[in-house]
From Swiss-Prot:
Residues that bear N-acetylmethionine: 1
Cellular component, GO annotation: cytoplasm
Keyword annotations of the record: Acetylation, ATP-binding, Cytoplasm, Nucleotide-binding, Phosphoprotein, Ubl conjugation
SMART domains per UniProt: CDC37_C (SM01069), CDC37_M (SM01070), CDC37_N (SM01071)
Protein's name according to its UniProt entry: Hsp90 co-chaperone Cdc37
N6-acetyllysine PTM positions: 80, 156
Subcellular location: Cytoplasm
Entry comment on modification after translation: Constitutively sumoylated by UBE2I.
Gene encoding the protein: CDC37
UniProt KW Ubl conjugation keyword: yes
Classification of source organism: Eukaryota, Metazoa, Chordata, Craniata, Vertebrata
Length: 380
């Protein structure tokens, strides 16, 4: 049966207690609380003194009992008086011990009968709070460290990675990874991705699709390890068990990811080819640049049609006639561009003898040599 008598008298101030109009209610509550705290502190101090006195008395009783046992073992004639003294002392100490225990019991009863107040109604259930924090992640490796790690791994295991990339059956892949668990890592997946792009650039599409399948296998294993928060080497068998017994929806997800990956590979390969073509065209353009840094092809295409015909015909006289009919400013502008691009080299008679045989060899552009001794250079 529950004893509810402890609730009969509770010393708790109520905000609705009526006080004299001339008395500040807040101050009255504060004074009451202060007096109550002082009484509690005094009571606690007396209780601690009783505890210390009782413990000290018990220690003396135990010490006296030990001496009595030692004296009884000795059983000497001269120790009889000492034995009687210790027995009397032990009797007195036991009497004091009972007195201390009686005082402690009275103190406990007094404490139990004390009315509850705002400070004793409840006690702390916890002295501190524990908050789970996310474990500190290892510092991310720098780009240089990752590249060096990848390079070292590939140099050591490239042959094994390529062998895995050529497998197709689930059982074969699982067995090969079981025999070479070091391949179950991010470096293998990265190498397979790059290999797929290289194969697509080389137009080896069928082989690319084969390697792409194994790339997605490795990526699925890594994703499974990340979701389970375990090392990939500890869960790759779980992936193969899951994929071999997977339902239709799971297999469709795998195949969808595979097709999306192949599309991304084709896109990356296309961009790489376009970039290579642009770089090649830029190199060729730089090789064509004339002494003034202009591209002869671009300059030729920007010339008026009548000047283009002159260069197509490689006729100097025709070129001179066309220039004489043009506005002097336009003629100077176009001929200067021809000189800067190398389409036209003025004052080239000195090299006529050496280069005469090479002139007119099929080049659609006018070179810096004359064909005959009576041809004149154009100076603009």
């Amino acid at each position: 049966m529950v004893d509810y008598s402890v609730w009969d008298h509770i010393e708790v101030s109520d905000d609705e207690d009526e006080t004299h109009p001339n008395i500040d209610t807040a101050s009255l509550f504060r004074w009451r609380h202060q007096a109550r705290v002082e009484r509690m502190e005094q009571f606690q101090k007396e209780k601690e003194e009783l505890d210390r006195g009782c413990r000290e008395c018990k220690r003396k009783v135990a010490e006296c009992q030990r001496k009595l046992k030692e004296l009884e073992v000795a059983e000497g004639e001269g120790g009889k008086a000492e034995l009687e003294r210790l027995q009397a002392e032990a009797q007195q100490l036991r009497k004091e011990e009972r007195s201390w225990e009686q005082k402690l019991e009275e103190m406990r009863k007094k404490e139990k009968s004390m009315p509850w107040n705002v400070d004793t109604l409840s006690k702390d259930g916890f002295s501190k709070s524990m908050v789970n924090t996310k474990p500190e992640q290892a510092e991310e490796e720098s780009e240089e460290v990752r590249e060096q790690k990848h390079k070292t791994f590939v140099e050591k295991y490239e042959k094994q990675i390529k062998h895995f990339g050529m497998l197709r059956r689930w059982d074969d892949s699982q067995k090969y990874l079981s025999d070479n668990v070091h391949l179950v890592c991010e470096e293998t997946a990265n190498y397979l991705v790059i290999w797929c792009i290289d194969l697509e650039v080389e137009e080896k599409c069928a082989l690319m699709e084969q390697v792409a399948h194994q790339t997605i296998v490795m990526q699925f294993i890594l994703e499974l390890a990340k979701s389970l928060k375990v090392d990939p080497r500890a869960c790759f068998r779980q992936f193969f068990t899951k994929i071999k017994t997977a339902d239709r929806q799971y297999m469709e997800g795998f195949n969808d990811e595979l097709e999306a990956f192949k599309d991304r590979v084709r896109g990356r390969a296309k961009l790489r080819i376009e970039k290579a073509m642009k770089e090649y065209e830029e190199e060729e353009r730089k090789k064509r640049l004339g002494p003034g840094g202009l591209d002869p092809v671009e300059v030729y295409e920007s010339l008026p049609e009548e000047l283009q015909k002159c260069f197509d015909a490689k006729d100097v006289q025709m070129l001179q006639d066309a220039i004489s009919k043009m506005d002097p400013t336009d003629a100077k502008y176009h001929m200067q561009r021809c000189i800067d691009s190398g389409l036209w080299v003025p004052n080239s008679k000195s090299s006529e003898a050496k280069d005469g045989e090479e002139a007119g060899t099929g080049d659609p552009l006018l070179e810096a040599t004359s064909k005959s001794g009576d041809e004149k250079d154009v100076s603009v």
